[in-house]
Amino acid sequence: DGGNIGFHKHMAMMSHITAGYSKEPLISLLHNEFNVKQLRTLKAKQLNRMIKVFVNGHWIGSIDDPILFTETFKEQRRISLIPAQTSIAWNIQENIIFINTDGGRLCRPIFYIDSERKPSYENYSHALTWNNLICGSNKKIDDFNTNIFYSKDKLYGEKKVETLIKNRAILDFIDS
């Protein structure tokens, strides 16, 4: 393997194969909470101007504001309201957002960097576990599962989203 041996070793040690989960709860969440417009409610002229949203290769609807959509999606994933192994990618040239929930994808963790160009983990004052790194360090229900959708109230009780964002995940999984 020559010069790529370090890269191969890193990928072998840090990579993770996703287990996957059903796309149906995510599609329901996208239509109800993310304002993804269903195709049957849109006219052809509207579809031409909007961004297409695909989940596991299926066109499930369209949106108007892809920046707000992807930022909100990632924030909800960082506070575990969307499973951590869900990937999102915005293809600007084709005006398509791809979301994947299927199993068998090779992914690897990356650190989030805050606005001061420091890793987000420097904001933590306590010891971190792997679950804290990928799901945030907010207190969750006892039988928390990273591949299940939870409502904010069921997972965290009455806490406000702004409070949850302070202790959000500092690692993200990206597809390799």
Question: Which stretches of residues belong to each language-model region?
Answer:
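Conduit-forming functional cores of very large proteins
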Residues: 1-176
